[in-house]
Amino acid sequence: MNKLFSMICLSALFGCSPVKDPVDYVDIFVGTSNSRAMLGPYAAVPYGMVQLGADNQDAHWMGGYEYSINNVKGFTHIHAWMMNGLMIMPAVQDLVTWEGSSSSPYRGANAGYHSRILKETEKGEPGYYSVFLYDADCQAELTATNHCGFHKYTFANDYDNARIMLDLNYPAEYGTDIHEGYFKVISDQEIEGYADTRVAGDYILHYNIKFNKPFKTFNGWKDDKVEKNIREWKSNGDCGGFVEFDVKKDESVLVQVSLSLVDQQGCKNNYEAELKPYGWDFDAVHQAAKQEWNTLLSKIEVEGDEADKKKILYKSLSGLCQTNLE
């Protein structure tokens, strides 16, 4: 009798569907086609300054991310109304300082450092985004805290000069004018700087960038002119920098970016409060971001088993809790 009762209980247990949390109903790709730059599958926490995600369009109205385009120009940290900031992109192609237009080639003459993606690998949930970059030959993963972005790039093969591009003047919905951009090498694993940016108004974005392994060189560029192996770089207009690494197959390069609209001390404070407690544990930051969303969304309970209605409600609610910095 006891054995029969146990078998019945086990049958009932395994016959039940897994219980889903509110955050599991959110599809971050809904509403990302024919939409504004503020609406993309960005890694963010509720009301976070950082909305880290892919850009794949040229500079024009309703630019930013478009779901139907199967490439990525880079991963930008801020997607707000008339405000954007610091695009990062891994690259293993021939060195170019232009990200490339949506219609330009990916190899050879006139190619940019943008990359095609394998669309079936594009995944995401609140606080996380991932895709395989075909031309950059790596898996890109993103997560975020309030003021910080966390990147993970896992390369599929060995490369002697894999690059992480740091682009200050990239395509944006309202365009971007860099009055002054600055990078300073603090160590072979840390860079700091700022971008004095002018869109409709002026703002200065300060950034601190940390890497989990030493880079070989830091290099700056303006237009197509490159200054190699330098410690400091100041320029304007179309400018940026890049670091170079030797990487092995299946090796991950991790990048932590702390931002502030105040000063460098603000960057350091944000790093100390939001990323340092996790060390280089990308998965822990990802899970913390997901849990933050789930805690917020759980404030509204939905009775019944109508999954479609839950998807609509929790997706809409998550959209209300994104920061536009207007």
Question: What does each of the following model-derived ranges do?
Answer:
Residues V19-E326:
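Accessory carbohydrate-recognition regions in carbohydrate-active enzymes
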Residues L4-L13:
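Sec-dependent N-terminal signal peptides
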